Amino acid sequence: MRRGKKGVTGNVTTIYYIEEHGDPNEGCDPNDEDSTEPQYLIKWKGWSHIHNTWESEKTINDQKVKGLKKLENFIKKEVEISWWRQQAGPEDIDYYECQSELQQELVKTYNNVERIIAEQNRELEGGGTAHEYFCKWESLPYADATWEDAVLIEKRWPVEVEHFKSREAAKSTPSRHCPVLKRRPKFHQIKEQPEYVGKDSSYHLRDYQMDGLNWLIHSWCKDNSVILADEMGLGKTIQTICFLYYLFKSQHLYGPFLCVVPLSTMTAWQREFQQWAPDINVVTYIGDVSSRDIIRQFEWSFSSSKRLKFNAILTTYEILLKDRQFLRSFSWACLLVDEAHRLKNDDSLLYKALKEFDTNHRLLVTGTPLQNSLKELWALLHFIMPYKFESWEDFEKDHEDAATKGYEKLHKQLEPFILRRQKKDVEKSLPAKVEQILRVEMTSIQKQYYKWILTKNYSALRKGVKGSINTFINIVIELKKCCNHALLTKPEDFESRASLATSDAVEKLLRGSGKLLLLDKLLCRLKETGHRVLIFSQMVRMLDILAEYLQRRHFPFQRLDGSIKGELRKQALDHFNAEGSQDFCFLLSTRAGGLGINLATADTVIIFDSDWNPQNDLQAQARAHRIGQKNQVNIYRLVTARSVEEDIVERAKRKMVLDHLVIQRMDTTGKTVLNKRDASGTTANNPFNKEDLNAILKFGAEELFKDDEENDEDPVCDIDEILQRAETRDEGPAMVGDELLSAFKVASFTFDEEKAVNELKKDNADEEPKDWDDIIPENVRKTIAEAEKLKEMEDIYLPPRRKNQLQNNADGGRRRRGRSGDGGDGDGVDGDGEAESDASDGEASADDDRPRKRGRPPASHREKIKGFTDQEIRRFVKSYKKFSAPLKHLDSIACDAELQEKPLAELKRLGEILQERCKAVLSETAEPSEQNEGRKNNRKTFKLGGVPVNAKTLAACQDELAALDDFLPQTKEERLKWQLDFRTRPANFDVEWNVSDDSKLLAGIYQYGLGSWEAIKMDSSFEIGDKILTNEDKKPQAKHLQSRAEYLLKLIKKLLDQKNGKQKMKKPRPKRANKEPVTKDIVEDDGSSAEDKKTKGVKNDKTEKGKLKIEEVSTHDETSNDKKEKDKKRKKDEDRKGDKSKGRKKPRQRGNEGIPGPMHFTANNEPRALEVLGDLDPSVFEECKEKMRPVKKALKALDNPDQSLSETEQVSRTRACLTQIGTQIDLCVEAYPDSQKVEWRSNLWYFVSKFTNFDAKQLYKLYKYGLKKNEASKQKDGKHKENVKTNNRNNHNSINHLKSFKKNSNSKQKSDTNDKKEKKMKLEKEKTDKHDKNQHTSGVKRKLEDGECDPEPNDNKRHERYVVD
């Protein structure tokens, strides 16, 4: 948004016009409101971003464009941001502006052509042609590619045009006849870097990278697929790409190469290909269905010869599994898998899917040491060399004693297939890495909060190992927050610090954390000496506090956490690494960095808080200690002394060494093999059990409570001593596999007193473990307990919560607040990016003395399915519903639910549990027990883990799809040949669709599940990919395919039932009381007598209490109130009529007693009941509304009758409106096929019933009766219809005939003269309320039903087919 010159809008504001002719808005003064106006940068649908124009609200409205709601939302958002700026602090505004600037930089890249993928000559409307290029834009998916004018593209991006031309004319495309695919050449060592490697020879391989390249080439020549397992940071990506480029240039093997990499490293792989192998045509096969369709159409092969265009495909695991049928149809010269440790489970779908690919060579790349068992190592070896490592049992038998006798035999067998090297071994120029643990004391406020948290959770802690592990974890997390900073435990309002001077605010921040006090001294000294620093923390809110501190200290910094996305992240990294950058610090989230981040320009790493898993901290250190680093890397790990944090670090080091890493060295290469798992039952995210957590919580707690509470002096530290020790050089671990231990140089700094950590641990080991009663003093416990009781009593008398407070409680989804007592201490506050519950929740759940609160049960009490999270279970259940006989299609379910890495055995176990519980719940609800006697037994749901599952819905889905499994062949080859052998109704799609397409659709559903239309479209074997999901405007789309599939499934189920001799169960109907034709009550014959009607099918008109039976109300009545009002009005009418009405029976009553209601008549078929549906679907209602728009006046006349007309005229007018409305309905229904006519006739009459007190059945019956009488009048009157007297006489006769059709009418025959009739009607009208519109309408309704007036003559030729002769 901007303020621009008035009228400077439209095409003259595009970037290419401005570059050629200058900016017409130049010199504009935004403050001059008279000559300027608000303008908005508009992205036009179907046009690329280079065609964006600045528009004002007036120009947009003048063009009458669609999508104005987007502009309204944008303006609304700008107003909200403007209001927020007035309330927010300067730090928040600065951060927002930084993010906005980075976002604008990202948007600018949308104007750059990344790749031209096609060209065409488009015919112009006025004659001639226009040459165009199909352009893929930078940072945007292929789906956003657009056709652009060739002149414009050639002028702005001539290099991309040249690259496109060279790709189109290239002869270096894949061929199956390449000789080296069948016979590998003899190996020749490469002693110098080839000239073609590295763009313009500006990139050079290091010695160890040349060795790695030679090893890869040697393995390929020996026909050995291999695993490259170098440590992170040694350039595995570069070595791999250079290997492919060697095959391309030296062996003339042009592919195709399939590279499967994580999405997070996709950009890095693209960049490295451009730099190291520029001649390889690499296509990134990612994106949605539309993007992948465009790639297959324009980037995959030449249209003329079907030869492959590309040399290498970059894709992800997820896309590969979605399109595995398509990708598996090609023969790949080389399969490359990055992050290959994801293939460690040989029972996972990902493993099995990739293993089936036809590949000539396989290369696995992993930088993560294998972690758990020898079988995982065998799984990788079996993947690359299935014939060499065929049997796991044999492999295990050969090496079962390796742990005791040594790994020499195993090394000898693995040497040709695995290469693992570490930085300290191969990169001698890489400086040393020195790590120190700096123990710091807590400040006085931290000690106070730490004691509060322990005391407050006393009832949960005293349970010890009997308590909930989740409760212990929550308490540990709260204590870790307190160790970092007091503000994480009890947040203060921002204004309390914003109003302070800078020095006072910094001092207040420092008093809240002993770590921050040490960090302040350390950073000041590091900045003076020219160092650059990386600061890591797990907690996002801690990064916020550090950012505030750095800003107030005026230290320039960058920040990277999970909220900062890919392109913005790249810009922050580039800014920090830029030559001459003034950035001093880089704040990083420990887990958000991911692989591929290079911050080698920094030489100091500060780990503010340690991760549960030391492996994550090692990866954090590697951000600076990697190739390109020229200085010694100093690593400072800050640990709060005598706290849970100190014990966690020590235990995590020991446990990770015992459970995970055993790295063995052989010759000059490192080989990764593993001992069998120690059955500890822990995970990498939480490597501690209950005993560990209980001991961690007790560590240092007793001494903390014994400290002199009056000693509130804040600590002071000697920074010179810290820096002196940091200069000590660490030569690296001497023992193999000792990277995790690192032989830390431990420095302990205490502020009040000096204590040896080893002595403290020795003393603790000698003592018996103390109980929490001995650790927390009794007086402290009593004080906290009294405070909690007092707060509980206050809560009882608190007024209702304000609306904004409720909103705050609801903020963030279902995040749970702390229970009573949490607010005071703030230890239950969430927001650090940790997925935890409040510690007090665990306390409440563990406290047996308190009554159980209603609501969701605690997480610790919920069932947990081993190996699956609730989110994974939810996806599994959703996919489970899509398949017939789902336990036979577990591989397809795993792919659909994105559970490809789960073993099929675990998936089968989960499926069986789901199936068993569904059957159990349905059997329970089918057989009511004594306990459920007297109440409804409608429980149809059950819990699978923490996921609720509707058993009835699940069973219904399985029942719908069950016939598919019995009907279709079991093998895919037979299914592709299989054809439906019965006729189906036309599909009415915009493409040609026949029985063969229906057969392929069912085969696709069998294989990929109901609703997986994208996967079916992708599978070329079904040959319907070009017919379905073509574009948004053409059928069939997903909803049309869903309807067609449901129809076909019903058909095959019906056929199977007939084949098996099953008959469809029908609902029992009441026996008909008479044998008369079903049309008797709809179209009455003129000769019928009142007596006949009284005796046919009529039950006693009295109820059990002797009262008159009230007419039933249609199911379309929206509320019971309407029904009551109708009953009251009807009762008043009956009372007003007196004894004359007691014997009257209405035709609709008789229909309710066994005779069907309105019928649908056709010339060739028997009459069918007109089904009157319930409330219409909103979309159907809107369609009905549009169809009935031509008779809008007639509908209004029904809704608002003219009160000045007499009742006779009112009846006549109503019948005329009904005739007009019915004619319109018949016209609308004619457009539908016979199978849908009945449904739409019901829908439209139901729509009309909303304008009257009549229901749909009554309206349709009256309409058909009017048509019959009009037809009879026309036949009787002949050509004398124009005679007014004759018409009046016919009117008079019709009235008499209608009178004879009154049900059970015992009243005296009315007078034949109109004068007597009008006189009687006037007397009746005096008895009713003339101003009551509904009462008047009720009289009209009664007249219409009794047939006391004949409708006006109408031309009803269109309705002759519905009249029964």
From Swiss-Prot:
- Ranges of Basic and acidic residues compositional bias? 1073-1082, 1090-1125, 1132-1141, 1271-1284, 1309-1335, 1354-1365
Query: What residues does the Helicase C-terminal domain cover?
Result: 518-669
Residues in Helicase ATP-binding domain copies: 217-387
| Gene Ontology molecular function | ATP binding; ATP hydrolysis activity; ATP-dependent chromatin remodeler activity; chromatin binding; DNA binding; helicase activity; histone binding
Classify the main location: nucleus
- So where does ATP get bound? 230-237
Keywords assigned by UniProt, alphabetized: ATP-binding, Chromatin regulator, Chromosome, DNA-binding, Hydrolase, Nucleotide-binding, Nucleus, Repeat, Transcription, Transcription regulation
Q: Where is the Chromo domain?
A: 16-86, 111-176
Query: Cross-referenced Gene3D superfamilies, in alphabetical order?
Result: 2.40.50.40, Homeodomain-like, P-loop containing nucleotide triphosphate hydrolases, Tandem AAA-ATPase domain
Which segment of this protein is annotated as the motif DEAH box?
Answer: 338-341
SUPFAM superfamilies per the UniProt record, alphabetical: Chromo domain-like (SSF54160), P-loop containing nucleoside triphosphate hydrolases (SSF52540)
Q: Cystine bridges: which residues?
A: none
**What PROSITE patterns does the record tag this protein with?**
CHROMO_1, CHROMO_2, DEAH_ATP_HELICASE, HELICASE_ATP_BIND_1, HELICASE_CTER
Tagged with keyword RNA-binding: no
Question: Its quaternary structure?
Answer: Component of the SAGA complex. Interacts with HMGA.
Q: What does this protein do?
A: ATP-dependent chromatin-remodeling factor which functions as substrate recognition component of the transcription regulatory histone acetylation (HAT) complex SAGA. Regulates polymerase II transcription. Also required for efficient transcription by RNA polymerase I, and more specifically the polymerase I transcription termination step. Regulates negatively DNA replication. Not only involved in transcription-related chromatin remodeling, but also required to maintain a specific chromatin configuration across the genome.
Protein name, UniProt field: Chromodomain-helicase-DNA-binding protein 1
Q: Which organism is it from?
A: Bombyx mori
